[in-house]
Amino acid sequence: AHPHSSDQVSVVHNGIIENSTILKKFLEKKGYVFKSQTDTEVIAHLVSEYLKKNSLKNTIIKVLKKLHGSFALGIIFKGQTDLMVGAKRGSPLAVGYGPNENYLGSDSYALKSMTNKISYLEDGEFCIVKKDQIEFFDTDGSNINKKVMNLSKDELNYDKGDYKYFMEKEIDEQPTTINDCINEYIDKYNNQINIYNFPWKISTIKSVMLIGCGTAFHSCLIAKYWMEQNTNLDISVDIASEFRYRKVRFKKDCLYIFVSQSGETADTYAALDLCKNNNMKTCAVVNVIESSIARDADLVLPIYCGQEVGVASTKAFIGQMLVLYILSTKISFDQKILTKDEYKAKLKNLLYLSSLAKKTLNIDQKILKIGKVFAEAKGSMFLGRGYSFPIALEGALKLKELAYVHAEGYPAGEMKHGPLALIEDGMRVVVIAPRDQH
């Protein structure tokens, strides 16, 4: 468990040091004895080693150049109660400002109970933090200035209220967050979508690639069906952790859309960075507008869901789908595929979404009864066709995340090509069948 220590140095670390094995051998030759298998201990010993002959600032510069991979570091020193060091590459790191005290944390959510003023470090940057002073440095050790952000009251005051769990609260918030999102993007009086600062002409975009991880990937899959149906663009979807390691053939006329609730998903951020390095058009669909992905993308489309604490995404999943649907509708209308009447009808239908969500949540007692049946299951299978297939994948993911039971999502038409062999006593099946062709 963190922190990991070496002599006078203690380190907490979020990320992965990819060359930890090589560094460990180097340090063992220097006489360091490792007490764990974690890559974090490598960092602690490395700092101790370089501190023998270097100033603190030069030590951090040398250590960061040795480390390969992603990390957010917090480092403290024995006997020095007024000193911390933070460093960032790939993983998020924020600095909080307080009266006669300062803080390090992964993001605004970690710091909100202590301060409403923060700064985010960018890749390669580090900081030396004292209670009344913070110095920021770039990779080479040159001093830099950082923008100070003020957190909103909503971010500072989010709690469970009368709910037992944050996730339960966030499920019930969905009708409200749907309305909030619609109000931000749809002008109800003029019947039009408002996406401000759209930096490209629609005619310059010939294809779209949607990229995400986990639940965000599922929202991308659903958006693929909508965009294929509503636009004349070529649409593709990729998992961020696969995209970043493939030989990608970048296209100048492609819009790359990155979906992430936190805006800090490491693989998604790495995929965005890859696109930025190749001068591609990039768009971020995020919940946290101060996040790394939001700061680096050309266009940011917030989902306006408010803070989501639950590990299993609920209201953010709805928000991601809603924003991607709105974007799909805007592109379709701008391409003159939708008539004005069809465009207005789609926007009008969206206005019913909040009340329909509320109606769905009112069947919670039925859901509780069904939940007891699934609690006794050997496994579960979720089936869907068309845009219901990604919903099936999401249902299976939720059951795995929350109940720790085996679940799989399949296209309904593939049932006969293998999965049917799993159907037996104790296997539960959920079929997603809305009142349309799917």
Residue ranges and their predicted role:
Residues 1-160, 164-165, 176-183, 187-206, ...:
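Conserved short alpha-helical segments that host acidic/polar catalytic motifs at enzyme active sites
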Residues 22, 26, 42-49, 62, ...:
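Alpha-helical scaffold segments in soluble metabolic enzymes
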Residues 89-92, 101, 120, 223-229, ...:
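Short, solvent-exposed amphipathic alpha-helical segments in soluble enzyme
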Residues 174-178, 182-209, 299-428:
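Active-site phosphate/pyrophosphate-binding segments
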Residues 203-352, 385, 432-438:
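Glycine-rich phosphate-binding loops that contact phosphosugars or nucleotide phosphates
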